[in-house]
Amino acid sequence: MKYNYSPEVDILIIRVSRGKLDHGEQKGNVITHYSKKGKIVELEILDASKETAHM
């Protein structure tokens, strides 16, 4: 698992598995990116500093 935080845009990207991104679904401030086979590849958290404060 790898992660990258971009403070300029306040986005946290968590790479959970290998594979190419095929499509994504957004629910609130979280975008879940999937492979063609439907496996979760990456999570993208928008407004990350606000979202992670609730964890």
Task: Explain the meaning of each model-derived region.
Residues 2, 7, 13-31:
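Structured beta-strand/loop patches that form or line metal/cofactor-binding pockets in enzymes
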Residues 35:
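Acidic surface patches and DE-rich sequence motifs
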Residues 50-55:
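A short, polar/charged loop-to-alpha-helix boundary motif
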